[in-house]
Regions:
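Bacterial Sec-dependent N-terminal signal peptides
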Residues: 1-25
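Alpha-helical tetratricopeptide repeat
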Residues: 19-365
Length: 365
């Protein structure tokens, strides 16, 4: 009996299957096409979902600084979708983070080919050239970007930085001016153009640019630079004023304390100078320049042991600081350590400071 039941069941299933096949065969061409299109849509949706999930995983790996994993996952996205410009772009960024600059440049180029509105891809290419110390290629890349997008102020600014670091101040001024023409309120471009003018000893133009930069926001380094231009121009009062503004904005700005102290020193206000140098050293006990400056005040006050202590530390921090060695030699002589003084003067001369040789000849031969 059980065998008959099984047979009937099997026959029923077989007939049911046959009946389904017969039913399918009765679909019209339009119905079959509709069915197939739905299946294709479902398959494509699954593919798109997988691409998105893989892209998200790659982005998460990038955010976690796991750049190797990020590159692998972006490659998987590209295999599934070779026209995905964003995947190429972010893969290029990950390669840049691993310092694989040549590979990054190629990948970023592909990102731009796929999306010619992605000017950031060109910008990052230029960054790769800069990081790889290929400054000429970086400049060409920035020029290409500015030709494609004349409103990209940061490209002009970064080009200026390259020229500034090479001490090509006229070219730097031209690039910074290009950035400022795009964005008249570009504080960094105004500041850095001012620094070019300061290096060229055109202090009026430097002051004008620094003043304009400070109007864009209270940033301590802007006031510090403005003060330095006033100091270079001989306007000590304005220099002290703006160094004080820098300190007011950032009370932990040790450089501004040291610089203001230098102006006080030049103005022979040694008590105020000493106070500022001490403040700078309290903020940074390894600030060699401030140590040397405080030693100069101590020396004038005939506090030679204090001066020597500061200069000892300064030389320890900067063994090739010829001026610190010269001054330590002078201080050692005042403390009757002639042999130590002569050694310092000789080394200062060996480092290129002619004054060291003068002291050595006059006191050691």
């Amino acid at each position: 009996m059980r065998h008959h039941l099984l047979l009937i069941t099997l026959l029923f299933l077989a007939y049911s299957s046959y009946g389904q096949e017969q039913a399918d065969s009765t679909l019209t061409t339009e119905e079959i096409q509709f069915r197939d299109s739905i299946a294709a849509i479902n398959t494509n949706n699954e593919r798109l979902q997988l691409i998105q999930e893989t892209y998200n995983a790659a982005s998460s790996a990038f955010a976690e600084s796991n750049f190797s994993k990020s590159i692998t996952l972006f490659d998987e996205v590209i295999v599934m979708d070779s026209s995905n410009s964003a995947a190429y772009y972010n893969k290029g960024l990950a390669q840049k983070e691993t310092k694989a600059y040549a590979l990054a440049i190629e990948t970023l180029e592909q990102a731009f080919v796929l999306d010619t509105t992605n000017f950031d891809a060109l910008f990052q290419q230029a960054k790769c050239y800069t990081n790889n110390k290929e400054s000429q290629k970086a400049v060409i890349a920035y020029d290409r970007l500015l030709l494609a997008d004349p409103s990209f102020a940061e490209a002009a600014y970064d080009k200026g930085v390259i020229f500034y670091l090479e001490k090509d101040y006229q070219q730097a001024i031209a690039a910074y001016t290009q950035a400022i023409n795009i964005d008249p309120n570009y504080a960094y471009a105004l500041n850095d153009r001012g620094s070019c003018y300061r290096a060229l000893e055109d202090y009026d133009k430097a002051i004008a640019d620094y003043l304009q930069a400070t109007k864009q926001g209270d940033q301590a380094f802007l006031f510090n630079n403005l003060a330095s231009a006033y100091r270079k121009s001989g306007n000590k009062e304005q220099a002290i004023r703006y160094y004080s503004k820098a300190i007011a904005v950032d009370p932990s700005y040790e450089m501004a304390y040291n610089n203001r102290g230098t102006v006080y020193f030049e103005s022979e206000d040694y008590d105020a100078a000493l106070k500022d140098f001490k403040a700078a050293i309290d903020l940074n006990s390894n600030y060699a320049m401030a140590l040397c400056n405080r030693a100069a005040v101590y020396h004038l006050q005939e506090h030679y042991t204090g001066a020597l202590a500061d200069l000892q530390l300064a030389v320890k921090l900067q063994p090739n600081n010829a001026t610190a060695l010269l001054n330590r030699g002078i201080t050692r002589e005042m403390l009757r350590d002639v042999d130590g003084a002569c050694q310092d003067w000789q080394k200062a001369y060996d480092l290129g400071l002619e004054k060291g040789n003068e002291y050595y000849i006059n006191n050691c031969e």
